[in-house]
Structure formats: C-alpha cells, structure tokens
Amino acid sequence: MLSNEQIAEFTRNGCLIGPEVISQPEVQELRDELDRVIAKGQTGFAPGEPQPVMISNMSKDKEQAVWQIVNIWEASPAFERLLYNSQITKAISQLTAKPDIYVWHDQIQYKPAKHGGVNNWHQDAPYWPVLKPATPVTAWVALDDVDESNGCMWMVPGSHKWGNHIKYLEQNPLEKFHELGKDFVPPLDAEVKAVRRTPWPVKMGHVSFHHSLTWHGSGKNVSDRPRRAIALHFMTGDARFVASGNHPMKKFIKLEDNAPMSLAGEHFPQVVRDWKPVGLPRSLKSAPVT
C-alpha cells in the first residue's frame, strides 16, 4: 500500500515513483513474451488466435523506432496476470480514491538500443475522447533499468492541474524536446507556476504512476541497452462511454452514449472491487506462457 505521504505527493505533482512490483524472473518472462509478439507482428497471428489490438511504430521513422503495442495482455497470459498485480491495483484505488477500478487498456513502449526515438511531450487524456471522465491514473512498469541514456520519461510536476494543453504540446518540435515550456504561462491560480522538466528514471521491475493530464514525454535511446516498459491505463467505476469520440479500443465497446464503461465487457476487466484487488481469473491461475 502507498503511504499518506506518497498519496499527497501524487496529488501535488501528478506523478510518483512507486515500489518494486515484479521480480527478476517475472520481468524476464514478460521480456520473452514481448519478443514473441513483436516477432509475429501485426500480420503474424493466425485467424482466431489471441492477439494485441495494435502493433505500430509511434515515431513513424523505421530508423528511430518507438514500438507501441496496445493490449498485449490479450495475446499473453503473462501480461494478463500483470493487470491483476495487487500492489499496482491497490495503489490505483488509493490514488484515485475510488473503490472500483477497471482496465482501460495497456500499452507497450519499446525503444530498441542505440536508435529508439523521441516520444514527444503530451498528455494522455486528450487522446481518449471516448471516456468521461478521462481515466485518471496510469501505472508504468519498467522491464529494464530506465534512465536518461536509454530514453526515460520526463515529467512536468504539477502540470496535471493546468487543464488540457495538448495543442500547445503537439506544436513543440521533436528537436526542441528539452526546450519545452519557455513560452508557456501556467494559470494564475495554479499551485505550480513554472514548467519544470524533470527526468524520471525507473528501476527494472518498479512502477511509476502519472495522472492522465500530467505533461510527459521521453528522449532518444542513445545507449546500448533497450528500453522496454508497459503502461497500464485504468479507469474508475465512474467512467462513461462517449460515442462521438474515437480510439482503437472503441470497436470493442458496444454501448449507448453515456453508458457506464463498467458494462463494456471482457476487453475491460475489473481489477478492484469495493476497494479490494480482484484475484486472478480461474483461466490464469495455471495458464502457461504461450
């Protein structure tokens, strides 16, 4: 469980480095599964075979790859088990102060050694227009030691209280990643009144939490080490479907506008119920890695 001090830090900054949540053997199992899924690619899965929703290069540059995989858990029992990690799910319930937590989707972020590119500054919530309120907290689990040399995230503490500024962030050129915010003035009533770009290293097997409106991005991987991580995006029991929005996960949502996302079905499993982490589904308790 997180301490009151940690919860207060997250409330103030919109980001928090958490504890170790998976062991070295578990990390290696997930790495092996990631290699298997990437080797298959978007077109390598047989008809009817469980597969991710999407595999893509976020950088759009084959020489500066940033691999993104959405819902790898649907293709891998090992990654599906991670969704139910009680240290993570209990922390999400604490940080949101909500008794019921559901998975929105997961997102692998993989920067290969020596050439993994920049992921520009952004906020998560504006890219999820099918949800209201936006999913509030993401758990980001490192599968390698992540630091500035291999493309760790950078955060702007306090920015989650400034509102939606995705248009401003999208205008920041990639080559000026480390110059963000020189021309930005936070709201006059904001608790934090300056753009303070902060490197965000995370140890292998540890988790980092960030709010869906916190400004964040990541630099190039210039090291000889890969930078592998998975973001677990969660939503609370308050989340509602916005039919006018668009998102890769929308095709799995068979709901009327403004319906509770808690009714969205098997692609959005519940992981906390009435403040208590949900145990592993029976199908996962003895499921082998595929």
Q: Which sequence ranges carry the predicted segments?
A:
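Short, conserved beta-strand element in jelly-roll/cupin
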Residues: 129-148, 201-202, 209, 233-236
